[in-house]
From Swiss-Prot:
InterPro entries: Rbsml_uS13_C (IPR027437), Ribosomal_uS13 (IPR001892), Ribosomal_uS13-like_H2TH (IPR010979), Ribosomal_uS13_archaeal (IPR019977), Ribosomal_uS13_CS (IPR018269)
GO biological process: translation
Annotated protein name in UniProt: Small ribosomal subunit protein uS13
Subunit structure: Part of the 30S ribosomal subunit. Forms a loose heterodimer with protein S19. Forms two bridges to the 50S subunit in the 70S ribosome.
Species: Methanopyrus kandleri (strain AV19 / DSM 6324 / JCM 9639 / NBRC 100938)
A GO molecular-function descriptor: structural constituent of ribosome
Region span, Disordered: 131-151
HAMAP family associated with the record: Ribosomal_uS13
Family recorded in the similarity comment: Belongs to the universal ribosomal protein uS13 family.
Length: 151
């Protein structure tokens, strides 16, 4: 492949990413990696943040994949306060989950809350807001028959 060509699609962590976007913004296409984590990964690996993802060499893409794998194991040099799962419920370790692993873990957490009948679990079961929002006028679904005034 010539140096001036840009790969239109790059596969990292089982996700097809847009090769025309700058590296940090392209990495946000992976579930569990936000813009701040994407910039942290680029700085950790010494990648040019202004480069397009499709312009990176295969070796650089491999390094990104390895760094994401290190994150999920908690072995990266990125500070643990940036991770999306600190003090895991089962293991007590700090880790950063991505992709299907993140979705599965969140679902297990919600199922655990439902099983122990915690307040948050009950709210999830009922399809109501979990974080204390008001429900008198918000989160209404479906049509209800209103009260008719006497004439």
């Amino acid at each position: 492949m010539a140096d001036d060509e840009v790969k239109p699609i790059v596969r990292i962590a089982d996700v097809d990413l847009d090769g025309h976007k700058k590296v940090p913004y392209a990495l946000t296409g992976i579930k569990g990696i936000g813009i701040r984590m994407a910039y942290a990964i680029c700085r950790e690996l010494g990648l040019d943040e202004e480069k397009k993802l499709g312009e990176l060499s295969d070796e650089e893409i491999e390094r990104i994949e390895e760094e994401i794998k290190k994150l999920s194991e908690g072995e990266s040099n990125i500070p643990s306060w940036m991770y999306n799962r600190q003090k895991d419920y089962e293991t007590g370790e700090d880790m950063h989950l991505v992709g299907a692993e993140l979705e599965m873990t969140v679902k297990q957490d919600i199922d655990r809350l439902k099983k122990i009948r915690a307040y948050r679990g009950i709210r999830h079961e009922l399809g109501l807001p979990v974080r204390g929002q008001r429900t008198k006028s918000s989160f209404r679904r479906g049509r209800t028959v209103g009260v008719k005034k006497k004439q």
